[in-house]
Amino acid sequence: MDEKVKVTDTEPTDKKVNEDTTLKEKLVEAECMEADMPEQSEEQDGTGAEETTSYLPLAADQLDLAKQYKQMMLFYEAGIRQLTTKLQILNREFEQSNDRNPIENIKSRIKSAESIAKKMKRKGLPMTLSCLTNNIYDIAGIRVICPFITDVYEVARMLLSQTDVELVQVKDYIREPKENGYRSLHLIVKINVFFSDGMRQVPVEVQMRTIAMNFWASTEHQLRYKKDKVITSEMHARLKKCADIMADADYQMQKLAEEIHF
């Protein structure tokens, strides 16, 4: 159960990787490599001979990194697919028993190579793929949007009751909001995914929040990261006030739901 998703760093056989080349640069290269590589095309030149489009061969270290990176992304994509399917089944099961859905929406994403490299640098981690897979657990992410606060915790309970889902970490920003007013339930889980060569435990971050929490978080993110504008302390205070208003609306809706036995 302690097995982790690992991608082994392979020493290039043709030449040593330049020490000044950062993981960020290499990951971005690997991420873009397949899109940039032209496909072979065949045309008749009138003489019956075939012309094949040629391109410069990639260095051995680039090919090796691209292969490892693609394999790593396959693991995380599979983890997202499997976890999403579980959530959809639990949502349908709950609907059959309660005549309503506890999940409003499910979204997923995989961090870009640039975002991964920035996070590793911020954490002071060695820029290697093996270190990445053993220390960064939010490369694959799922966001679950629920109507009510109680739905958030019920869906989390149902998910964690699955025997092939292991809880790694929980951060409850609903009961203990961040200073800026952010509210959400964050889970890091490992899910068993079976491949042709065996089973792997894939880490996935699951963010669970209400519709109101998601509205505030999404809008606040757009405002905060407007690059050509400066967010003043007064604006931060207003954003925090909006978060508190949304939280109060959540609790009022929850009380109404309980009063009418929803």
Report the location of each language-model feature.
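Glycine-rich, low-complexity intrinsically disordered segments
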Residues: M73-F75, P102-S108, L132-T133, I145
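Short, flexible, solvent-exposed loop/turn segments with mixed acidic/basic and small polar residues
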Residues: M127-Y137
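Eukaryotic low-complexity, non-globular regulatory regions
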Residues: D2-K70
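Surface-exposed, low-hydrophobicity interaction/linker segments
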Residues: G79-I80, T84, Q88-L125
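Generic alpha-helical secondary structure
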Residues: M72, Y76, I80, A113, ...
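Long beta-strand-rich cores associated with HINT superfamily self-processing modules
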Residues: T133, C146-M253
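Terminal, regulation- and interaction-focused segments at domain boundaries
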Residues: I139-C146
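An acidic, glycine-/histidine-flanked metal-binding catalytic module
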Residues: D45-I80, L87-E93, V204-F262
